[in-house]
Amino acid sequence: MSESPHDHAGDPVRLSAWVHGHVQGVGFRWWTRSRALESGLTGYARNAPDGRVHVIAEGPRERCERLLELLRSGTTPGRVSLVVESWEPARGDLTGFEER
């Protein structure tokens, strides 16, 4: 995780997480959407042509970090082998949380 002096606990952030493994066709995007909505996050989970799922989530850093922990928890549908994350300031261009 990269942090800058401008990161503050209450400032919204944007999490981009590429989820590798057996994560398509197993209810993974639905599960991710449910966890994100429970946390009050906005964003989406989208299947990639190469078999990964791309998760974008915006909200308070603590809530995004919790979603990231859940993605890595081993309790997801399917089988997650790797999650590659990146962080940036929230763009504020998302509403709700969608499966795409």
Curated annotation (Swiss-Prot):
In its UniProt record, a GO molecular function of this protein is: acylphosphatase activity
Record's keyword terms, sorted: Hydrolase
Residues annotated as domain Acylphosphatase-like: 14-100
Q: Which Pfam families match?
A: Acylphosphatase
Matching Gene3D superfamilies: 3.30.70.100
Q: Which NCBIfam families match?
A: PRK14422.1 (NF010997)
Q: Which family does it belong to?
A: Belongs to the acylphosphatase family.
Q: What's this protein's name?
A: Acylphosphatase
- Write down the species: Nocardia farcinica (strain IFM 10152)
Q: Lineage from the top down?
A: Bacteria, Bacillati, Actinomycetota, Actinomycetes, Mycobacteriales
